A protein has these predicted regions:
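Rossmann-like adenosine-cofactor binding region
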Residues: 173, 206-281, 285
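Flexible, glycine/charged-enriched surface loops at secondary-structure junctions
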Residues: 68-73, 108-113, 166-175, 223, ...
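Buried hydrophobic packing segments
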Residues: 57-60, 154-162, 291-295
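Glycine-rich phosphate/diphosphate-binding loop of Rossmann-like nucleotide-binding domains
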Residues: 141, 145-233
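Conserved active-site and cofactor/substrate-binding residues in soluble primary-metabolism enzymes
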Residues: 48-56, 89-93, 97, 116-120, ...
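N-terminal ligand-binding/catalytic initiation module
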Residues: 1-140
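Adenosine-phosphate binding glycine-rich loop
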Residues: 162, 254-329
Length: 329
């Protein structure tokens, strides 16, 4: 088992977790522990190279520092990625070994569920560390799959953005495009379908699209085209870097408010959206519901109802951000 520590960028610690016996290849990045232990999910993805995985985990962990701070949590920013290889037949052993690596941080990194992960995987990780969340909850306790809370926060953020930009107090009759209908996108469609929204969806996984078509009144769009539909709100809930100098000129929306991390490919892309008059809800604010749930589960200081109340505050928080941005422009 190799535990290699390197220093890069402004991060406090980057650890390459390699284990020849199981085949585990993972990276854990701690961006900051200024506000508390670094907390952030673990992503399972088929990266083309270790360099690609490193680039991803560095951006994601830095974003977690902002997300946790904006949510008012006593957490710093961290993230982990597990590189999924072609031969992943011993996945359970890999997840358990990853738990050993997490435990070696002695609580300075707390892991959670992210893209590609499930509650069952988190339970396997928890066999070797207590510094893990997203475990099955009991009764009214906080915990479990964090994605419904993430989606609830996105809904509250969309409502705030619609009030600010469109002057509408209800979402009924609006058209919203949801890119990505995995855990977060699925629950967002569930919430939106209850308030009379016309929902367009797309995902690289056809089975996910079939699921939301079966359960909700949605319209499927080709994945390559979903960003460029004429809609009131675009809600990216897949992977990041989709807002860039190529895509932004083609957008036909007034609002972008979604759950994907690192939606802007570069800082300049925020300026490009501003120049086009598109209101952008910062991803590290609007998608903070999941980490709020993680904090309540880890510290045991809030039940499920209290978590919902805290997550609902994302709407007013974004409204204040929109007002301040308007004042400073």
């Amino acid at each position: 088992m190799v535990f290699q520590n390197v220093a890069l960028d402004s991060h406090e610690k980057i650890v390459f977790c390699n284990d020849d016996k199981t085949g585990l290849r993972a990276i854990i990045a701690i961006h900051s522990t200024a506000l508390g232990p670094a907390a952030g999910g673990c992503r399972l993805w088929s990266y083309q190279s270790e360099e690609e995985a490193l680039f991803d985990v560095l951006k994601l962990s830095k974003a977690m520092s902002y997300k946790n701070a904006m949510a008012g949590l006593n957490f710093g920013g961290g993230k982990a990625v597990i590189i999924k290889t072609e031969d992943f037949s011993n996945a359970d052993e890999i997840y358990e070994k990853f738990g050993e690596f997490v435990d070696q941080f002695n609580g300075s990194y707390i892991t959670a569920e992210d893209v590609g992960m499930t509650m069952r995987i988190m339970q396997l990780i928890a066999r070797n560390t207590r510094h893990v969340t997203g475990l099955p909850k009991e009764g009214s306790d906080a915990g479990g799959d964090p994605s419904p809370k993430t989606s609830w926060g996105i809904l509250k953020g969309i409502e705030a953005a619609v009030r600010f930009k469109l002057g509408k107090s209800e979402l009924d009759g609006l058209t919203i495009a949801v890119q990505g209908v995995g855990n977060v996108g699925y629950h967002l469609c569930k919430y939106l379908s209850k308030v009379g929204v016309n929902i367009l969806v797309a995902d690289i996984d056809d089975n996910r699209v079939k699921r939301v078509i079966k359960e909700f009144n949605v319209t499927a769009i080709d994945y390559e085209d979903i960003l460029y539909q004429k809609v009131d709100v675009l809600s990216p809930c897949a992977l990041g870097s989709i807002l860039n100098k190529q895509s932004i000129p083609r957008l036909k929306t007034e609002i972008i408010a979604g759950g994907a991390n690192n939606q802007l490919e570069s800082d300049q892309d925020g300026r490009r959206l501003f120049e086009r008059g598109i209101l952008y809800a910062p991803d590290y604010v609007i998608n903070g519901g999941g980490i709020i749930n993680v904090a309540a589960e880890y510290y045991g200081d809030a039940d499920d109802d209290q978590v919902i109340k805290k997550v609902s505050a994302i709407g007013p928080r974004l409204n204040n951000i929109f007002k301040e941005a308007e004042r400073l422009k």
